């Protein structure tokens, strides 16, 4: 399980650094989710992100120190200018839509297609329906998102960056699944140490197929 970690760049020994990318339409709350997770902050006057931005936070998972390096699209999505370099090296992704704006959910398949075209094929992905605090303005039923997540093999949660609902849970879920996948790949490599082409002894940050929790059993945890 993931434990609490330090906000910002914690010092000390780090066992793994995992790059995670946030993708989705503008104004769905990606930067707010990042600020809430990395610094436990929320600004009502948040402006669109300009320029490349990433923040870090160190977590403890299974007695290992894991540094989450979370990248924001920096507003490039408005110009469809997100490049392959943004996805390079990512082992996890948060696919974010605004549950009060149906079109942001309808654009998710396009974002997923782009992600899968540029990222490692085994990247761990969680679908996030943000702004769950605006339930009276909901335009995307939970069941629609659940069905899509199950079909595509994604994890799924609804969050609110405003009141912090499920923000910690969503990042912890993603980081734990990445760690489990990497750990299984390392064990498999060590078991294959007699193979001259083995990668035993190296830390592998790209997820393998592993035995991940099936999406159908991992999409039940939405905000209350």
Swiss-Prot record:
Topology relative to the membrane: Lipid-anchor
Domain of life: Eukaryota
GO terms under cellular component: early endosome membrane; plasma membrane; pollen tube tip; root hair tip; trans-Golgi network membrane
Full protein name: Ras-related protein RABA4b
Lineage: Eukaryota, Viridiplantae, Streptophyta, Embryophyta, Tracheophyta
Function: Regulator of membrane trafficking. May be required for secretion of cell wall components in cells.
Residues linked to a lipid group, S-geranylgeranyl cysteine type: 220-221
Pfam families the UniProt entry points to: Ras
PANTHER family: DRAB11-RELATED
Modified residues (N-acetylalanine): 2
Keyword ATP-binding attached: no
Tissue note: Expressed in roots, stems, leaves and flowers. Expressed in tips of growing root hair cells.
Subunit structure: Interacts with TCTP1.
Protein's UniProt keywords contain Repeat: no
GO biological process: cell wall biogenesis; endocytic recycling; protein transport
């Amino acid at each position: 399980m993931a434990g609490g970690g330090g906000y910002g760049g914690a010092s000390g020994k780090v066992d793994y650094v995992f790059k995670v990318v946030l993708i989705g339409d503008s104004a769905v709350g990606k930067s707010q989710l990042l600020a809430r997770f990395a610094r436990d902050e929320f600004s009502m006057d948040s402006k669109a992100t300009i320029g490349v931005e990433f923040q870090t936070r160190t977590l403890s998972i299974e007695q290992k120190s894991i540094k989450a390096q979370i990248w924001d699209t920096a507003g490039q999505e408005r110009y469809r200018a997100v490049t392959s370099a943004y996805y390079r090296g990512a082992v996890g992704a948060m696919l974010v839509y605004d549950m009060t704006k149906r079109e942001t959910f309808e654009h998710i398949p396009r974002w997923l297609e782009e992600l899968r075209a540029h990222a490692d094929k085994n990247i761990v992905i969680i679908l996030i329906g943000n702004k769950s605090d605006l339930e009276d303005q909901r335009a995307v039923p939970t069941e629609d998102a659940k069905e899509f997540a199950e079909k595509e093999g994604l994890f799924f949660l609804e969050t609110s960056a405003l009141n912090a609902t499920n923000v910690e849970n969503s990042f912890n879920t993603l980081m734990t699944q990445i760690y489990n996948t990497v750990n299984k790949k390392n064990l498999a490599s060590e078991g294959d140490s007699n193979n001259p082409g083995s990668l035993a002894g190296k830390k592998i940050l790209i997820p393998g197929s592993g035995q991940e929790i099936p999406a159908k059993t991992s999409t039940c945890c939405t905000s209350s």
